[in-house]
Amino acid sequence: MSQRQLAYVFDLNKCIGCHTCTMACKQLWTNRDGREYMYWNNVESRPGKGYPKNWEQKGGGFDKDGKLKTNGIIPIRADYGGTWNYNLLETLVEGKSNQVVPDEKPTWGPNWDEDEGKGEFPNNHYFYLPRICNHCSNPACLAACPTKAIYKREEDGLVVVDQSRCKGYRYCVKACPYGKMYFNLQKGTSEKCIGCYPRVEKGEAPACVKQCSGRIRFWGYRDDKDGPIYKLVDQWKVALPLHAEYGTEPNVFYVPPMNTTPPPFEEDGRLGDKPRIPIEDLEALFGPGVKQALATLGGEMAKRRKAQASELTDILIGYTNKDRYGI
């Protein structure tokens, strides 16, 4: 059991799908040495199949009795999409081709269904869902590892893999219900998001948090009652875990999208009264607390429109870096 737990809150109402977080992580951690296909941080469009493809259907996690599920499916290479080779030499140097193309026809990738969403115009909808390792309090990957290579850091609760102990059995890949454990074929070991702990140890925020241009990411210790994590998760209860039913007690929380876009049109062309993003779709991701969270958010926004003060909206705006993260 770790002494303290670092956690994240992602405000989905502010995410613009720019992937700056993804590129920050990719350039720092996964652009070499067998990690090229890995995206420890990814931003997927929902509704959608996600990354790896259909990760929600691959099992893992714990059952209702708290027992580790052993029926998880290891994603195949195609589920992640290609890291294709291109004819750069022939095109840019030798002049044998006038077009840069991949060496094989792409059929899937990390953002293959980006911005597709669900529904038909003018009632279609989608939103962005950034995902990293949840650094769970009850990690299924840790429970599944027979060599005890996976552990939670005592000082901050980050879940990491001891590469010297990992034997490459991939039980952890099967066990993670979020599809955030990866296998490095070049090294023969499992790897994952490390919460940027080398940066954390220097007092710096993780790269994905620091580089977020939409300022959607909040980061800090769960028990810091003066910090944004505690206030959004425990005090205001507007930040919810993703698929809490998996039983891993994730430490990444999401402020659900508020349906502030116009409601869908009725058949006669008039605006209806139903939310554009169906509440049941949001509850399938974030659980039964969605309605109350949205009601709280809506109420606080209404106060601001009346020029009244709102601590919650001030927190969510996150005027400065210090307002959004720090340890």
Curated annotation (Swiss-Prot):
Enzyme isolated from cells grown in a tungstate rich environment shows a 20-fold reduction in selenate reductase activity. One of its GO terms (biological process) is anaerobic respiration. Binds 1 [3Fe-4S] cluster. Binds 3 [4Fe-4S] clusters. It comes from the Bacteria. [4Fe-4S] cluster 1 binds at residues 15, 18, 21, 212. Keywords: 3Fe-4S, 4Fe-4S, Electron transport, Iron, Iron-sulfur, Metal-binding, Oxidoreductase, Periplasm, Repeat, Transport. Has potential use in bioremediation of waste sites contaminated with selenate, such as agricultural drainage waters. Optimum temperature is 65 degrees Celsius (with reduced methyl viologen as the electron donor). Full activity is maintained up to 60 degrees Celsius, with activity falling to 25% at 70 degrees Celsius. Substituting tungsten for molybdenum at the active site of SerA decreases the overall stability of the SerABC complex, rendering the components less thermostable. [3Fe-4S] cluster binds at residues 145, 166, 172. Its EC number is 1.97.1.9. Component of the selenate reductase, which catalyzes the reduction of selenate to selenite and allows anaerobic growth with selenate as the sole terminal electron acceptor. A c-type di-heme cytochrome of the cytc4 family was shown to donate electrons to the selenate reductase in vitro. SerABC can also use reduced benzyl viologen or reduced methyl viologen as an electron donor. This subunit transfers electrons from SerC to SerA. The reductase is specific for selenate, and cannot reduce nitrate, nitrite, chlorate or sulfate. This is Selenate reductase subunit beta. It comes from Thauera selenatis. The lineage of its organism: Bacteria, Pseudomonadati, Pseudomonadota, Betaproteobacteria, Rhodocyclales. The gene is serB.
